[in-house]
């Protein structure tokens, strides 16, 4: 939807406000505010500010019609002017009406303005409408010039694949003029690619009355199309245009001509499609009722028992009827839509909505012509009024879609026209919506799953509109939600032989006749039935994901389509991961039991359960399995079913589920057996499965803390604020923290906030208070040691406690500290409390984070995919070299929480991988400038508050950070607490958007391609090495590797990993990078992978920063003297600084290209900065040795690693 | 010796073989309003000091020009910049550190004769004769930082801090009267004052009829419209 651009919030157009007009008695009565307007009722045709169905008197007219009370007003006006000239202007009738209706229909003016603006943008430019009109004129002339005659073999291929071809087709020239159909006719063309449909009717002469049988009609139709195409190509008016054939709606029986005009000004966005239809009277009316057979088994050389009734071909019949009834249907639509801007706009809105959801695609798509017909239907049923506004049209359609059931059939035909029993017809189709002729089912090809999906989406749209706490516009219209991001797992079968095998062995002959041997719908039916039966309530919906067939040049042969299938599975998280499928009891229902056994094959066993029942059952795992393993149960079942029933080998099938979950698994390099612990650990465990261990240990610690005796003050509350406690820590946390030489060493520390009971004796001075806090912590530490035998040590941040191999950092929170930090004394001696960055950080850590942590924890309890989604997202950001300093980790967590909390899909996400893809979508397509992400936990914010916040956000955008996040717990800091102007900065934000778009592109290509497998994690989870100016390689033995699955660095190949335990809470690399950023961010940007990355990538700021400039005392930072009294920043000097700061850590500095070249050539790596040829090798070596020596003295703990480093380097 | 606009420019070297060095711009410190901590004639003013340079290292270097009384940093030249720079860093139990950015330095010598000597140095060398840097960076720095950052034992400083609060009569015989005591008065807080003012306002306000006269009704309707406009059009 490139066409719908960001809708800027604009003030109301100036013209809208009428001039100061008469304030008549009627305005006063209008002020009575009788605010009742039922939205669903068509009778109240209230105007909501959209284009009026009937022209309205202009306000200017109004003033002229009511000239009398002017003299009175003159006085009054003056009176009001004294107040506030702008706002207190007497209202006009129109304004009153508009204001009131806006209030009744929308929560805010914003939605109205946005919709209005979108519709304005969707309006077709006049150059297109003019072009279409001219084209139609010339085409009509062209068709009149056509001559009758026998169709010889033309140089064009007939765009149809049939087994038995007919010969001797005689072309007769059309007797009726070609007509615009579909969107072009109803005036609802939608960009960015405008497709204009034109129908040309074959005259009756071309067809015989027996042509209904065995695809003869379709062949004649195709021949007719070919002939017309041929003639057009030789006509000078069209010879420049681009001709191609395509299948309409992926239906191989419906070839259409796609014509891209050569005219420059339209060729980019305009396309014309030519349909061939036939007059309705060609065949006998009852010929194509659903139960008739029009393709005989003999056509496919099949035997058919004479006695048996011929199988019905309802889908084929509908395909022919589509052509026959087209004119009549179009006439009906035209009648309803022509000249009614409100209906047209309503349909446009619905079309946008449908297209963003990709539900209108392909053979099984819920096309927009169904929606158009439905609007007519609602109008007929008097549910939609002629004068309903476009918003009401859309809303009513959604409401009716959600609340009606078409499976029993609805019909457009008048009572007299509907000759056959509706329920009988409905029995032949999944969904039934009869057209005006009473013969064609408009929804013939729509499977039940797709229809249910449309209904669910419609229901969601209504819910979103009703949600007063939300501006639903972006969710309904702007957000692109491709189907693959809405399904949890995807089954993809593209293997030719498997497809053929299924069609030949498992498709019923009746289905073959019904779909005229088109493979796709048959496959769909076979697979859907089987999976639905096997997965039962594990799955909420099975949806076909179709790719639209691509056009082919008219000279080449028509391709065979439908040789691949992709199904999306939406899982029900409540049932999908059950490990057991129980059959009927073998005693009570032996037949059912046998059938169950037959269905499941060897997997089914007779089992005795605890309640004494003995039944057949299938077991897919144990209840103790890790969640990531359980998520693969559905995959297991599907694979088994396909193998057992359809004899498909697992290598012929692609089942896309949990491929990316790999990234938070424990690295295979790390051997779990080396960890000394009482816990049972598996080698193939992951961060998600390990989190509960930490949480359990924390719970124990909390219990012990509560139970401590003799503390001067009671511990009131203990809360954990570490990501682990909300399942958001992407690194597997193993119990390996330990005491070494009086220091605690741990890879992670878990932060815990303690609050003590009230006491008035706390000092009123910051340092005294902090001293007392420290004393308290020491007291707690000593008590823990004495009573619970836990090791502890005190640091400047808090009390480190070691328990069962996990390390906790206890902090004391006290209100007074916060107050003292905020305290300021004004000149008058009055104490004021003002937020400052330090107090904000403290408040966030001590008071807000515990609450948000709790809320996110409970979010994970209700959506078990939340945690793992965050894990994947954090890993992804880390591998793109975005560390916590430039992208706050809480931003990731809250954005993912936003995805799970906002109901932007009818079903909750059950698979983390899907969650991650949706996050990528969010990152790639969000309008950061216009959107504030609000997490209204427990709905504790009121409408008014939300309104105020959004108002302030929009009117004062500059004061908010580029990415604005707010939760319901941080009201006074709303939008400014979790992110700042620097993290993430605007630059980083757009960088992330770009990365996300790139990742999505990769995912989409792999999904759409027939041959490619799903994207490998290594493709997504390894950053690009391009765009960086310098890479500082760090010594690999000084930086511990991440415990999670490492997919490699963008710069160098794998090295021997090390898993050294750093001192608890110390991350020297992060600290140095922080220093570098604070000192040098004006000149360079720094990137590294916080998950064990061993390179620091540097990007210089634009060259202007390094240009010579005049001497100014205040702007001398980092400047060296250059010629002519000017100064400039020299990059080499800065590099020297980096080296100083990274002393002992850096191995060498080079450009990424050099590094790559060296990696390729496996050269002996040069030790030092290459750009410095004078750097003499021996000197640097001796210096290095000295440094190593120094480091040894300074850091005895690192001795082992440093010694180890030498042979390591000599290896490379 | 290079000079620019009255500043002497010297390189700041971190090692004896350093090629690319930062330039430090120095001159005698002189402004009209002198700061007692930066006495006239004895203070050397240095511009563009790299972030990692410490007070001690500069002090150590400038010893060769004469005894150094103190070295102070600031983010930029200016009156209270030095105070701002060190704000909060000297308090016990505080994790506040001075910012890590390019800065200016004031070196105060004991004798004014040292200034000339200092301005004559060819380069500022921040390394020992052995070649080792006088500034700790990298691994050294991060390993040295011990968890016990406070100088005295915790209990002592705690006592000291608490003692500071309960001050008795000071040297001049003045006693600080706090909010303790019998007649403490109200707290001089913004919220308290605000509450009091509001109360007074409410008291002075007479009870008035709000929806009685026609003009009042008309005005309230007007107000209604204004609010609606604000809600649906404004923003």
Swiss-Prot record, chain A:
| Alphabetic keyword roster | Chromosome, Nucleus, RNA-binding
Q: Which GO terms describe its molecular function?
A: RNA binding
Does the UniProt entry include the keyword RNA-binding? Answer: yes
Where do the segments described as Disordered lie? 1-72, 1156-1212
> Where does the secretion signal sit in this chain?
none
> Could you tell me which PANTHER family the record lists for this protein?
NUCLEOLAR PROTEIN 6, NUCLEOLAR RNA-ASSOCIATED PROTEIN
Q: How does it assemble?
A: Part of the small subunit (SSU) processome, composed of more than 70 proteins and the RNA chaperone small nucleolar RNA (snoRNA) U3.
Its annotated function is as follows: Part of the small subunit (SSU) processome, first precursor of the small eukaryotic ribosomal subunit. During the assembly of the SSU processome in the nucleolus, many ribosome biogenesis factors, an RNA chaperone and ribosomal proteins associate with the nascent pre-rRNA and work in concert to generate RNA folding, modifications, rearrangements and cleavage as well as targeted degradation of pre-ribosomal RNA by the RNA exosome.
**Record-given protein name:** Nucleolar protein 6
